[in-house]
């Protein structure tokens, strides 16, 4: 077994209100007054108040924009190369800043033995892992792993890899860092998929420190469980194009997850000899308000059971892979502040496939 010792989060410098983001999207997608009203309704009902971006363009006048310099559909969009230039310039500094917060007071950076980087919004070689190593002056012999292009559930997959490292190297100090710049891939072409992406996705970073089971107080990981709903493989996808990464996100996803989620939870908890009633805290990836509502209905739970997920959605939007770690950080902070002695946490995130990835953990 292994433990999550600490989690830190970070966001890029530009904080945009959902109302400003609606105004920007309305410039791009508005065909007529009726379309504008529909778009405004969707933004208001999103459950999101703020989102962060690596770019200022979404809430400044058009003449001041530097990347998405015009909303005119006839003008060409930034190509994939320009988008990756932004990622390569800003992803590593944000990752390093977040890692340093994560290990502060826990370990010295020279004690880091493993580094796992996670992203589905930017890739290159040398990549984020080597950029972080160089900026932090980490040992060149460090064990590196990159989890790329897996989407919103990738953080759990990375934690699963880190858990395996801890089991084989009990004295390991493992850093997992998830860094996503989803707003880099804004698309001007009007489609349901582009519209949905424009109202949900944001930028963010999260880092965690994992150690072996002999470590001090932390979150002990008990079990991982995953399932794939191939019937939903066309409903959620993430593909590379000349003009950035393209998201497919259908309205059927909440119902697909709802239909199978109770069974998923039962199967996952059965591996640890637990039942749904044993879970004290639910760490659910806030992929969208409807997804959280559908899961609550499937498990016969209330909105109050997912408050940390709703708060992250409200304050940050869906940042893809780091999002569930924002939720988990909130849960861990609340447990510590309330001096809770024991807790059982069930976590779940979803992504292309349609993949459902889960973990079960205890806090003691």
Regions found by a protein language model. Give the residues of each.
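Structural motif
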Residues: 116, 175-177, 208-210, 283, ...
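Claisen-condensing/thiolase-fold acyl-transfer catalytic domains that form or cleave C-C bonds
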Residues: 96, 120-121, 139-141, 146-167, ...
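Short coil/turn connectors at secondary-structure junctions
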Residues: 1-2, 109-113, 140-143, 168-174, ...
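A short glycine/serine-rich beta->alpha loop
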Residues: 81-87, 117, 144-148, 193-196, ...
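Condensing-enzyme catalytic core mediating Claisen C-C bond formation in acyl metabolism
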Residues: 1-86, 173, 182, 186-255, ...
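Short, well-ordered amphipathic alpha-helical segments that serve as non-catalytic structural scaffolds
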Residues: 44, 48, 90-104, 205, ...
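Active-site-adjacent elements of ketosynthase-type condensing enzymes
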Residues: 124-130, 176-196, 225-242, 289-297, ...
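Conserved beta-ketoacyl condensing-enzyme motif
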Residues: 42, 46-137, 276-292
